[in-house]
Amino acid sequence: MRPLAIIGPTGAGKSQLALDVAARLGARVSVEIVNADAMQLYRGMDIGTAKLPVSERRGIPHHQLDVLDVTETATVARYQRAAAADIEAIAARGAVPVVVGGSMLYVQSLLDDWSFPATDPSVRARWERRLAEVGVDRLHAELARRDPAAAAAILPTDARRTVRALEVVELTGQPFAASAPRIGAPRWDTVIVGLDCQTTILDERLARRTDLMFDQGLVEEVRTLLRNGLREGVTASRALGYAQVIAALDAGAGADMMRAAREQTYLGTRRYVRRQRSWFRRDHRVHWLDAGVASSPDRARLVDDAVRLWRHVT
């Protein structure tokens, strides 16, 4: 069974569509879902990542959820190996793998033939020391001098990716983008469906999503994770929502600080959505569907369209 990938910006409704597609196909074939959201890999990061509770998964097996402790570093290479093994095992069982998520590099590493450039611990350590000495702003400026295209694609606050880009440029003598995957036929003949909607609609959803996270206990979730080592987690501690709450707690956890954390989480998510859209819209293989529908008949048609694409796209 060839896979179906459901991708798109945060808040578009990818997880719900995956469940609905699984229900539609369930009478004829089994479906198993493979997560492609980097932060949902972490155990305990549930509220802030909008991870589906087990009780809402309708008995459908989910893979690549809760596979890392918050102290571990999530890497695209590790995910690619593990998720590819999941997809091949699911297909071997005669079930349909459905990849669901919006983490751009994770999705593309899985669906394209992406060989990762070598790493050198001594080179990496040298750039890590440089980061500690001068800070991420100056290190990002150094990347801009060596590889302007990479610097333009990496946020100035993303220390981990800045260090990795500088390492690759030094080791290969080529721009960082030279190691990126080439878009061709997707692996396993995967059909890629994209969900998106009008910006005004999605912004409203993101505002509700952010409020719901804080109302459901994101702050307490962060407190619990801090006791489990979240602050030492290179990747997990920088996740949207979690980083903002950590900063608010460090500043005294006052009401004003928490309101600011909520607003910064919303604004940060909107910025991330812009990056997701820019990335995914470049992929000519994606079949886009309108996620702005609200009525039950329209939702049913959305599911019909996704299933039809999976069955008939060549």
Curated annotation (Swiss-Prot):
Enzyme nomenclature, EC number: 2.5.1.75
General function of this protein: Catalyzes the transfer of a dimethylallyl group onto the adenine at position 37 in tRNAs that read codons beginning with uridine, leading to the formation of N6-(dimethylallyl)adenosine (i(6)A).
Official protein name in the record: tRNA dimethylallyltransferase
PANTHER family attached to this UniProt entry: TRNA DIMETHYLALLYLTRANSFERASE
Family: Belongs to the IPP transferase family.
Additional notes on this entry: Was identified as a high-confidence drug target.
Quaternary structure note: Monomer.
Any GO MF annotation of the entry: tRNA dimethylallyltransferase activity
Residues that, per the record, bind substrate: T10, G11, A12, G13, K14, S15
Residues bound to ATP: G8, P9, T10, G11, A12, G13, K14, S15
Gene3D superfamilies according to UniProt: 1.10.20.140, P-loop containing nucleotide triphosphate hydrolases
Keyword entries, A-Z: ATP-binding, Magnesium, Nucleotide-binding, Transferase, tRNA processing
Catalytic class of the enzyme: transferase
UniProt catalytic activity: adenosine(37) in tRNA + dimethylallyl diphosphate = N(6)-dimethylallyladenosine(37) in tRNA + diphosphate
Protein's gene: miaA
Top-level taxon of the source organism: Bacteria
Pfam families: IPPT (PF01715)
Cofactor: Mg(2+)
